[in-house]
């Protein structure tokens, strides 16, 4: 169920402060965050945000198509290594 329009998008305060500070200074340093639940807003365009995936921080460059999505969508938490190919030695019979 989508969030109510009167509430607006959710962005953690500490992340919003860091983005606003860099926008006012005109710098584009990497912002490290654990806030996967924050929504991408237009103020973040052009910034690189390192989103934590549970093990490391994945750098995500924010573009127009990402606005409205959550940061966690761009840093997958699970790595699928593929199914093991059928092993003839393990089958007996």
UniProtKB/Swiss-Prot annotation:
Pfam family, one: Ribosomal_S19
Coiled-coil stretches: none
Keywords on record: Ribonucleoprotein, Ribosomal protein, RNA-binding, rRNA-binding
Lineage: superkingdom: Bacteria
GO molecular function: rRNA binding; structural constituent of ribosome
Gene Ontology CC terms: cytoplasm; small ribosomal subunit
Annotated gene: rpsS
Family matches, as PROSITE patterns: RIBOSOMAL_S19
Family according to the record: Belongs to the universal ribosomal protein uS19 family.
UniProt protein name: Small ribosomal subunit protein uS19
Function: Protein S19 forms a complex with S13 that binds strongly to the 16S ribosomal RNA.
């Amino acid at each position: 169920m989508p969030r109510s329009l009167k509430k607006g998008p959710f962005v953690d305060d500490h992340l919003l402060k860091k983005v606003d500070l860099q926008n006012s200074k005109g710098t584009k340093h990497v912002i490290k965050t654990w806030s996967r639940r924050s929504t991408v807003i237009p103020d973040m365009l052009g910034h690189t945000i390192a989103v934590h995936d549970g093990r490391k921080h994945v750098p995500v460059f924010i573009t127009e198509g990402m606005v409205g999505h959550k940061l966690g969508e761009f840093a997958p938490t699970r790595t699928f290594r593929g199914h093991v190919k059928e092993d003839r030695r393990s089958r007996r019979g």
